[in-house]
């Protein structure tokens, strides 16, 4: 039954009932869901065949046990019958055999005194007539002496019991009878108590069987209760451990949430710095674009003046590069005033050469001042023109934040799994170390007990040696040895005793 239950649980674990052909969802050819895999089907068939085989073996074993019990019962009955046959064989030599139970009443005529021969003949005739009447071969009045059927109260009955055995034989037992007075004059048999005793024995046997059955059931229930109690204790311990683990996980989650907030704050600071830098760069670009527009307008004015005037006059006075640079430095302070001074009304009266010099100096100043912009080297095309749309990709999006949070969650899970693995390894190492410590402790205790036994044996031997030494010394004193030998023996014995005491003193701290 244990194997069948085990295979049933395995079959339920694979998703199919233990005794059925297939799962409910997989039956039928037109099912909507996909069918089971070949490995699952093969395993299911194997489990089904094994369960069927185990059930058959279980039934056969039960039948075999029933047959064995039946044969044992029959054997006991046959042994009892054999004993009864043997006892019957011994009793047949002492008792008469009758075909049925018969009670014979002794009448007044049979009780009269008569001669020995006539009494014996009368008794024989009476017995023959009684047997004939019992067998139904003779009529009631066909004997040599008439039968007396009067049953008077208070007379003596001779009782004969016929016992039938199982082998077909008949056993008779004759009793002396009883004297009993009844209003109807009916005698009562003594052996009527035997069936009641047998019934009492049967009732007692039945009660004993019921008691044994109840005791067996009580033991089974007690074992089940103990198993359930241990299971409940185990589940309570597991629940407590789960609660502790849940509390630890909640603490970890709170700590990780706080760390996540800190990480978000750390990430938001560089993002804000980047936004400010982007805005500053965009403002510089806008200012450069406006400056380029102004320079282009001034260049157009210069070109118009060049076309209207003689070109040779423009480049009349062209000093050296150093002189021109010094002049440009001197004219920097006068730039704003001259720009405002030379309005559209006074353009015709000014020298075009001075205007061109001023414009070139202004361009050079602009070029040397804005090194980061490089406005003169740019070309307005799609590759170099910077607008606000170029910086939209720098802003963090929600998808990027979600990916970062997902990566952080994966990192947290990996860290937790790593910690769990390390915890398991630590637990295994601790268990191994505890086992080794227990083994070492047991070995130390065993060695200590052995050492104590050896010390006790040594003390016993020392006592025996001291006793022998004293006996030898006493015998030597009785033999009256010389004083020198006595002194030497005494000194030797004292030296040995002192050495033994020193050894015991060395051993005692080691034992403690």
Swiss-Prot record:
Keywords: Coiled coil, Intermediate filament. Residues 496-512 have a biased composition (Acidic residues). Pfam families: Filament. The keyword Nucleus does not apply. InterPro entries: IF_rod_dom (IPR039008). Residues 480-492 have a biased composition (Low complexity). PROSITE patterns: IF_ROD_2. GO terms for cellular component: intermediate filament. Residues 473-512 are annotated as: Disordered. Residues 50-479 form the IF rod domain. This is Intermediate filament family orphan 2.
